[in-house]
């Protein structure tokens, strides 16, 4: 227990909060990485599916697990992708999303609605 004098001299340390997306660093909204493994995994209870995810190597950080949104994808090992923050609630440890339509990952085929989220250009 500190004395009043010690508190006056040094004060109390503030709480430091843990970053939700440490791989993006302080000021990067997105980072580029290389896929090391592309696979499917099952979500937590009570959901049931085969969710598509990829292990992505980010230079200067390490490997993270990122979710591949949308129906169908063309990712394989050594594909270069752009990741953003954003967790997947029913997949433990998945704290990043891969951006569709950027670098090696194509946009979703035949997508008509919410196109900008899935990297699809306006057709017609």
Curated annotation (Swiss-Prot):
Gene Ontology annotations of biological process type: translation
Domain of life, per lineage: Bacteria
Family annotation (PROSITE patterns): RIBOSOMAL_S12
Any one GO MF annotation of this record: structural constituent of ribosome
Family annotation (Gene3D superfamilies): Nucleic acid-binding proteins
Alphabetical list of PANTHER family matching this protein: 30S RIBOSOMAL PROTEIN S12 FAMILY MEMBER (PTHR11652)
Family statement drawn from the similarity comment of this UniProt entry: Belongs to the universal ribosomal protein uS12 family.
Protein task: With S4 and S5 plays an important role in translational accuracy.
Identification of the protein by name: Small ribosomal subunit protein uS12
Organism lineage: Bacteria, Pseudomonadati, Pseudomonadota, Alphaproteobacteria, Rickettsiales
Gene transcribed to yield this protein: rpsL
